[in-house]
Amino acid sequence: TIRNYFLKYPLKVRQQVRFITMDMSGAYMPLARRLFPNAEIIIDRFHIIQHLGRAFLKTRIAIMNQFDKKSLPYRALKNHWRLFQKDSRKLSLNPFYSKTFHQTLCPHEVVEKTLNFSEELANYYNLYQLLLFHFQEKRGDEFFELIEENISKVNHYFKTVFRTFRKHKQYIKNALETHYSNAKLEGTNKLIKDIKRLGFGFRNFINF
């Protein structure tokens, strides 16, 4: 087990560990605190953004399903979903032809047109983007103030995420105050998954 692996190291050595980056898995946090009593726990930034993204994704789908499947709002929300997940500041400025709207538009114009179909979606989109902004700019106080202001008003998708963030508030603030992350490790894991997917189950590419 992970516990037994790290217990191979003397307590004196483990006490020298200053930082640990991890996801929000409840099982590992108590273990990390026991094994490395002097370390600050840092929630990996990727996982924080991922939680917010999933909450908005589920919200968009729920609102999308309120429309007829043949309607323009439904098709716009379904076909251009990736644009809504992005940080709005990173949307491309290059126009493209939208088969959904039958016209050439910039990504931000597609987003604006689609948000006009639903005030509820527009409100959640603005909340999501503001949370991303505060997080990316490392404004921890503003990030959590926004959560506190909205936790009683949001749907259960966002409420669940907000409660999780509340629970790990200090660890998330640590993520905003330090430069540590699991980015390289996550990138390696993704590469391994991609290789396995492309391998179609073959264990040895020589036998392919």
Enumerate the predicted regions with their spans.
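Acidic/histidine-rich catalytic cores and adjacent linkers
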Residues: 3-42, 46-50, 69-208
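Short alpha-helix plus adjacent loop in nuclease-associated cores
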Residues: 48-69
